[in-house]
Every structure is written in structure tokens, then in C-alpha cells.
């Protein structure tokens, strides 16, 4: 009897996590059937770990345009609309955590934690401008999401479009979040250690855009504190 009650509770919690209004799959595909707004190529079984300890395994993907976790069921998409109930989401070995109403990818945990915010912009694929070239500037039509009641999003995408993704890096130190995009911005987060960090970057040929390099750099900075 207890097991049946637990299953009912988990089912109710999962229902609360998804929006009531679905987004049809066909509305978010391009002419070739691809969905470039999504971080992963396909929806795959993932894990949604709730703060209460329950775990669900729906088909998941991450929408880089809305920065929301998306749940697929019966050929429809649902935004996970109550991220405050979630502890962690795992998709294909990648860990995400809620930050406000959106999700960040986790690269490092510990006293200094490292995250990536995947920010996607939808824009038209561009017009032909001669010699077989394509100009995005000639037809840059950005598509914005439309917020509906309850924080739900529906993206009316054009037939052909591209997604420009800009990674924003975040570190959490002393319970404070700080963002950076470049090496210089990262060094500015540690003004008292700038000389040592510059030497480490040069000596180890660190490239900020390489996540393994970045993890190594953050671990080094943590060792200085």
C-alpha cells in the first residue's frame, strides 16, 4: 500500500513540473526535421531528481533559446515549469541545475563551482547574395519566444533558421555568482591573484573556451584561496 501511495505522489509531482499547454513537435522542426534550438541531437531518457528525493526518467532535452528543460511525451513538448522543486537534471551524462527559472550546466562543484549558461538566439538562415554566398546580415530576423501564462513558452519558428549559441560562464564563490566570457574578465574576478593566474594560463596554454582547460584553471584558482 505504501509503495502505491509513493507512486501516486511521484506522479503528481511530475505532473506539477510540466506545463499544461503542450508545444507540438512539428512546430519546432526545420524543413529537414532537425531541431537546432536543442542542446542534444535527440530527446533521450534522463533523470529528474526532485528535492524531496524522488527520481523520474522522462525523455529530456535542453532548449538553448528558452534555457529551459523540456520534457517530451506523446509527440508533444512540455517545459518543466517548476524548477524550484528540482535538485538536479541529468541528460546523457550532463548535469544541469536550476538557477531561477532557467537551467545551467554544471562543470565543477565545491567551494568554487563552475557553470555554463547556454544562451541561444534564433535567426533566419540568410538570403543568397551572389556567388553562392549567404548573408545573415541581409535578412537577420531574430525570433523571440512568447511568454504565456504560468511561465510557458511557445516558439513559432520559421521553416528554415539557425541558432547562434553563446556560452556564458559562471563561478560561484562565497555564495556569490559571477559571470565571464573572456580570459580578461575571468582574471578580473581575482584581482589579488592576477599575476599568478596569468602565469598559470601562459604556462599551461589555457584556452577559456576549452571546458577541460577552464576546469583546470578554476581548480588552480581554488587552490590559491
Language-model features: where?
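Aromatic-patch recognition
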Residues: 56-178
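A short, solvent-exposed beta-edge/loop patch
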Residues: 153-216
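Short, solvent-exposed mixed-charge patches
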Residues: 224-225
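Bacterial Sec-dependent N-terminal signal peptides
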Residues: 1-31, 217
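Short N-terminal segments immediately surrounding and downstream of signal-peptide cleavage
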Residues: 29-45, 49
Amino acid at each position: 500500500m505504501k509503495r502505491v501511495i509513493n507512486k501516486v505522489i511521484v506522479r503528481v509531482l511530475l505532473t506539477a513540473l510540466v506545463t499544461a499547454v503542450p508545444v507540438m513537435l512539428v512546430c519546432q522542426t526545420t524543413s529537414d526535421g532537425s531541431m537546432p534550438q536543442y542542446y542534444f541531437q535527440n530527446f533521450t531518457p534522463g533523470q529528474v531528481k526532485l528535492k524531496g528525493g524522488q527520481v523520474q526518467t522522462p525523455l529530456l532535452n535542453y532548449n538553448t533559446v528558452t534555457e529551459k528543460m523540456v520534457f517530451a511525451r506523446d509527440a508533444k513538448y512540455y517545459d518543466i515549469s517548476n524548477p524550484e522543486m528540482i535538485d538536479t537534471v541529468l541528460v546523457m551524462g550532463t548535469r544541469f541545475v536550476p538557477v531561477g527559472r532557467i537551467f545551467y550546466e554544471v562543470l565543477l562543484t565545491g567551494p568554487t563551482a563552475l557553470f555554463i549558461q547556454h544562451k541561444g538566439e534564433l535567426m533566419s538562415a540568410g538570403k543568397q547574395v551572389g556567388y553562392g554566398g549567404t548573408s545573415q546580415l541581409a535578412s537577420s530576423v531574430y525570433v523571440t519566444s512568447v511568454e504565456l501564462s504560468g511561465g510557458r513558452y511557445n516558439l513559432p519558428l520559421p521553416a528554415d533558421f539557425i541558432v547562434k549559441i553563446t556560452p556564458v560562464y559562471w563561478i560561484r564563490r562565497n555564495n556569490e555568482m559571477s559571470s565571464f566570457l573572456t580570459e580578461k574578465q575571468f582574471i578580473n574576478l581575482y584581482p589579488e591573484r592576477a599575476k599568478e593566474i596569468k602565469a598559470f594560463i601562459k604556462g599551461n596554454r589555457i584556452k577559456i573556451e576549452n571546458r577541460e582547460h577552464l576546469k583546470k584553471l578554476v581548480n588552480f584558482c581554488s587552490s590559491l584561496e
